[in-house]
Each structure stands twice: as C-alpha cells, then as structure tokens.
Regions:
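Extracellular loop-to-transmembrane helix junctions
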Residues: 50-97, 102-111, 122-150, 262-268, ...
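Hydrophobic alpha-helical segments of multi-pass membrane transport proteins
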Residues: 179-186, 334, 339, 344-345, ...
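Helix-loop-helix junctions that connect adjacent transmembrane segments
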Residues: 17-18, 174, 178-234, 280, ...
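Loop-to-transmembrane helix boundary motifs in multi-pass membrane proteins
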Residues: 27, 102, 141-149, 245-268, ...
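Cytosolic C-terminal regulatory domains/tails of membrane transporters and channels
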Residues: 1-18, 472-713
C-alpha cells in the first residue's frame, strides 16, 4: 500500500536545526530596528503633544527638553534590570507575574495587549497622514483605505517571519536616522547663538509666572505636559518583551539594544522640543508641528543655486511616515509574544502559545492586526481621537513593573550588596511612571480614557474566566488520571520484547502523555478490537510553543519528556502481553505533526486503525468551547477517512452524564428476525422473574413454618 500523504500547504521545519536560532535571532542593531522603531516614531506625535500643552507658556519647553531624556533613561534603567532578571523575555508581564503575583501579571498583560493594538492603529494613521500631507488635499479623504491596506500588508509580512519583516523595513529605519540626524543637527548648530537669549527669557518668564500664578501652577503645567506626551515612552517596553528573540548572550544584547533605544529617543525627542522653542513654531492648518519645524529649518537651503529645502522637508516627512509604519509593525511583532506568554499561563486560549511553521505566533498576529483594523474603522483613522486612547495602558505596565522591581530589591537586601542602588533606580522609576499614569487618567478620562480602561478591564475579566475554565478542566483530568492510573502497577516493569507484525492489524493511538485519557483510549480499543489486533503503536507530537522556543536546551528537555512518556506506554503494553512501539516528532504545528506521524505509522503498518481520546465535560460546553480547545483530532480524522483509513475518537465522560438513557419518542420498526429474538428474550426474562418469585415465596413459607408462634410452649 502506498504511503499516505496529506495535501501539504505548509513547509515543515526541523526545530532541532542548530542554525535555526542563529538565523532567527536578532543582533542588537537589528533588534534596535525592529523593536525600537515604536519609540522613535513617537516623535511624530509625542513631542508635539507636549509642546501644545504649554500653550502660552512655551518657555517651559526648556525644562521638558531636559526632563524627557532624564525620564527616558530612568525608565530604561529599570528595564535593563528586567532584562537581566528575565533573559527569556516577557517584559512587564513576566515581571509583574513573578514579582507581584499572577493577578498583577494579568492586569499588566491585558494593558499591554490593548496598548499594542492602539500602537498599530495610531502609528499607521499617523504615518498615513504624514505621507498624505505631501500629496494633493483631495487624497486626504481616502486615508482610511490606505490605513487598512497598510495594516493588511504588515500582517502579511509578519506571517512570513520575524527577521524577514525587519530586513524589509531596515532601509526605512536607516533613512529616518540619516535625515533626522542631518536636519535636527543642522537646526541646533545653525541657531546655537540663540541659546543665551532662550536661557535669559526662560529665567525671566519663570520669575514672572511664579510671582503671578505661583510655583504650584508651573510644576502642574510641566507635569501635565509630561502626561499628555506619554506616547513618547511607549516603545521602551518592546525591548524587554523581545529579549528571547535576540542573539546570545541575550542579556548583553538586550541591554545594548535598550541603550541604543534610550539614547536615540532622548536625542530626537529632546531636540524636537527644544527646536520648537528655538524656531518659535506653531501649528498650521494641514501641517503637523514637525512639518512646520522642518520647513523652518530647511528654509533657504540650496544645492548649486537650486532650492533644496522643500525636497529635504519632503524626504524627512516621508521617512517619518514610513517609520510610523515600522512602529505599527512593532506592535504586531511584540503583542503575540505577550499573548503567547499569557497563554502559557492560561490567561488566554492555549492556541496563542503555538508557533506557526514560520515560527511566528500566527493567531496573535492575526488578532492584533485585525483588532487594529477595527479600531481604525471605529475612529475613522483620526489621530486626534486615537492619541487620547493611547498612552494610558503602557504606564499601567510601567508602574507595575517598577513596583515589582522595588519589591524584589527590598527582598534581596540581605543577599545583594548592590540592592540600595538598584532599589533607588526602580523606586524613582515607580514615582515617575505612577505620576504620569495618574495625571494622564485625570486629564484624559472624559476625553476617551474611560474607553481604554473599560476595554482593558474587559480583557482582564475574560482572562480570569478563561483561567477558571482551564483550571476546572485540569481538575477533571487530574481526577481521570487518578482513576485510570490505578490499573498501572506501582513499579511498571517492561515485559519481554514481543515481535511486531507489520502485516497484521494495528491499533494506532494519538496521545500526548502517559495519562488517564490515553490509558482509557487504549483499554477501550483493546476491549473492542483486541481479538484481532497484532500491534499497538503510539504517536506523540512534541509541540514547540512559546515556552519551548527559547533555545536548543529547552527543545532537548521537551524531547526527553516525550520519549519518557512514550516508553511508559510501551512498558505498560508489554507488561500486559501486547506488542507495542512508538513514533514521535516535534513541530510548531500540531496538525502538521499528527499528519507526519500518521504517514509514518501507515508506512510501517499498512493495516492501521487510528484512535484518539477526547474528554467530554457536558457541564463546561458552551459557545466559546471551540475557541478554548483545538479540535485537531476531528481535522485529522476527516483527512484520514478521506484517504481510506479509519479513525475512532473515544469519548470519556467526566461529569454531567445523564442519570438514565434518553427517551425514544419516534416509532421504531425492526426486522422480523430481531423481533423474534426480542420476543424470545422477553419470554426468558418473564420465566426468570416467575421462577425468582416462586423461589422467594417458598423460602418465606419455610421460614414461617419453622418459626414458633407466640403463646406456645
């Protein structure tokens, strides 16, 4: 018989290839490009929001131009600690879960998921507006179509794989760095003589306003501007989340990436805010504040007597817009990493922890990408609306992260001689981030902040319900394991190696581990077909999810685990006098792995009958059951049957079983032979009942005769 081959729409990859992690991992420079673009692109809307908040008191921009870089380095210093403590990635979610508890981790993760959706949406919307501002005004009305098209393109390239998408976007990132370095550097150097005047005017204005309004007013205005420009900081989290995709040594690579990011963000954001003040720019109809600034800086530029200023401004705006698309890509890249970590902890459906055969969390990419499309359609792609929703959630994560670090260093004060300095960094970070969070919620609550908090609360609630469901299922399967494993000898010793018969009938079992479900399936099949089956074959698929895709060591541990479970099935079968063997494979795709295993089983045992077990919990069935549990057994069953092979899914009811058989309400006809058999059986049953009644009556009569009556001697 020919070896069965399923239709192949995906390309299998050897997960044990030692070059795989090297090829997919990112050096510090590529990580800066792929994960740092979110922060740098925020210069398109973060600094302008800060400057707009100072309306009438623009002189305070000097303090913000200094304060923004300081706060960036404070937060990034805290995240350098996160990278050192958690080199396998996880960022703020893992930090909060480990240092503050699972529920804090759920809140942090939910906030990050919503924030990354908004990152993708606002970045695409801002980038589209930046590009369309260089086009005829009639094009502006079509921006929502452009937004959706760009998001769909980003989803596509991310489904192709992490490193490939970064290589596509690398030229854009470098063009942004080049144009902005030239433009901002020239702007500062050409007006350096104005610095003394700016300093003098700032001191004079501070004195005047402090006398007129008081120092509290000035401090409050600075803090309000900080909070409204909170989008400037949002990209700092991405590096800590993505440490596990960086090249070894991961900690050093991650910290170098964080240093590159913090330095570049501080220079760009601080320079922009100072240049707004230096060039006295103000917003103009149809132009962003950055566009006005770039035009002012390049005014009078010529090359060979030909005006070059407008062209330089155009090129700079184009690179700015394209970098915003890279930032959207960062949200789509990083959110699935957070979701995969949450799925491993069972706050999200377990399928989000699976990687596709291109080593991308396919489900997460699709969900985040299309959620961003929905947000864009709901808001019409208006940046003014999106920016209100944007910066709250990341500061929830920042605050929880810094609180967790502070708690950790306090607990380590007797073990770590450097705990005081590290605590000072994390505590300062907590004060900064908590202050910005509180002010942002206060300022933006009525303007749409309530919606962001509501959506985050809904995600938290759903995560808790999902966790409760999985916990209930785990309890049920544990009870099943306890019941079924009682049939296994305490010290399972393998019997003699019985010869396999490749030409004989073979029962093939899809199992995941040596557990109650697998044993129930095996014993049920043995009871049904054991009379003619010659071989028992077990197929195990080691699924490489986010938890295992962290290096060869984790994969080797997975291999040892799978083979140990398989050998237990073999030992049990041989102990019972059954010829058995097993096959195992390792893949990022469960269905693909089961297909490969079925192909191999049929190659060696052409007369195969397939079995798989399924836990039936009728009390837990609901409309979302299919989302929480992958029904891959049914998919494989359908494909096997299509190719002419039988597969039985053996159910095991664990609760919610009806107490009596269901009523039969339809009239049922039967063949005369069966009716005759039934009549004979009825007659036999009636005779048995009569004989039993007669025997019981005789026994009672004998008892009465042998019992003395009252009053007799």
């Amino acid at each position: 018989m020919a070896w069965l081959r399923f239709p192949r729409f995906r390309r299998a990859v050897n997960v044990f290839n030692p070059k795989l992690f090297e090829n997919l991992s990112l050096a510090a420079f590529l990580a800066w490009v792929g994960l740092g673009s979110d922060a740098l692109s925020s210069s398109a809307y973060g600094p302008p929001e800060i400057y707009y908040a100072l309306k009438g008191h623009e002189y305070l921009a000097v303090f913000l131009a200094i304060g923004i870089p300081i706060s960036v380095f404070v937060i990034s210093a805290g995240y350098r600690q996160v990278i050192a403590l958690f080199p396998d990635g996880g960022g703020g979610y893992h930090t909060a879960s480990t240092l503050l508890g699972p529920k804090a981790g759920l809140v942090s993760g939910a906030a990050l998921i919503v924030d990354y959706v908004l990152t993708a949406a606002i970045s695409v919307a801002s980038g589209t507006e930046a590009l369309l501002s260089t086009m005829p005004a009639s094009w502006y009305g079509e921006r929502i179509l452009v937004d959706v098209a760009i998001l769909l393109f980003l989803i596509f390239i991310n489904l192709r794989g992490m490193k490939e998408s970064i290589k596509i976007l690398l030229p854009i990132f470098m063009a942004f760095i080049l144009t902005h370095t030239i433009l901002l550097g020239w702007g500062l150097l050409s007006h350096v003589g104005a610095v003394p005047d700016i300093a003098y005017n700032t001191v004079a204005s501070v004195r005047q306003d402090s006398m007129q309004y008081g120092w509290i007013f000035i401090v409050a205005l600075i803090l309000r501007a900080f909070s409204l420009g909170g989008g400037t900081y949002t990209g700092l989290e991405a590096v800590a989340n993505g440490v596990h995709i960086m090249r070894e040594p991961r900690v050093q690579t991650g910290q170098r990436t964080m240093t590159l990011l913090a330095t570049s963000l501080s220079l760009v954001a601080g320079s922009l805010i100072f240049l707004y003040l230096m060039y006295h720019v103000h917003g103009q109809q149809g132009q962003t504040l950055n566009a006005v600034l770039y035009g002012a800086i390049t005014r009078g530029w010529t090359v060979g007597g030909i005006p070059f200023g407008p062209t330089a401004t155009l090129l700079t705006l184009i690179t700015e817009g394209l970098l915003l698309f890279i930032a959207a890509n960062t949200g789509i890249i990083t959110a699935p990493i957070v979701m995969a970590n949450m799925a491993v902890d069972r706050w999200l459906p377990e399928r989000f922890s699976y990687l596709s055969d291109r080593f991308v969390s396919r489900n997460g990419v699709l969900l985040i990408g299309f959620a961003a499309v929905v947000i864009l359609l709901m808001t019409g792609g208006h940046v003014s609306i999106l920016v209100v929703l944007y910066s709250i959630n990341v500061f929830i994560t920042f605050t929880l992260t810094m609180a967790g670090l502070s708690r950790h260093w306090l607990a380590q004060r007797d073990k770590d001689p450097l705990w005081r300095g590290r605590l000072a960094v994390s505590a300062l970070g907590f004060v900064v981030t908590a202050s910005i969070l509180a002010i942002t919620i206060f300022e933006k609550f009525d303007a749409g902040g309530w919606f962001t908090l509501l959506v985050t609360a809904i995600v938290v609630g759903l995560g808790y319900l999902i966790y409760r469901h999985y916990k209930s299922i785990s309890k049920i399967t544990a009870e099943l394991d306890e019941t079924m494993l009682d049939v296994v000898p305490e010290h399972l010793e393998s019997g003699p190696n019985l010869p396999l018969d490749p030409r004989g009938a073979t029962a093939v079992f899809f199992v995941s581990r040596f557990d109650g479900l697998g044993l129930h399936t095996l014993l049920t099949a043995h009871r049904m077909v054991g009379g003619f089956v010659k071989n028992y074959v077990f197929l195990l698929a080691g699924i490489v999810g986010q938890g295992e895709f962290k290096g060869i060591k984790a994969l080797e541990d997975l291999k040892v685990y799978v083979e140990t479970e398989a050998n237990q099935y073999m030992a049990f079968c041989r102990n019972e006098g059954m010829a058995a063997t097993w096959f195992a494979t390792y893949s990022t795709d469960r269905i693909l792995a089961m297909e490969e295993l079925a192909n191999v089983a049929i190659r060696y045992f052409p007369q195969s009958i397939f079995f798989a077990g399924r836990v039936i919990d009728t009390s837990a069935q609901g409309p979302f059951h299919g989302l929480l549990h992958d029904e891959v057994s049914f998919i494989v069953q359908d494909r096997l049957q299509h190719d002419g092979f039988s597969m039985m899914i053996v159910p095991v009811h664990v609760r919610g079983i009806p107490s009596k058989p269901p009523n039969i309400v339809l009239p049922i006809s039967m063949s005369p032979d069966l009716e005759l058999v039934q009549n004979e059986e009825v007659k036999k049953e009636e005779a048995r009942v009569r004989a039993a009644a007669k025997a019981q009556a005789t026994t009672q009569a004998n008892i009465q005769e042998s019992t003395p009556h009252a009053g007799t001697e």
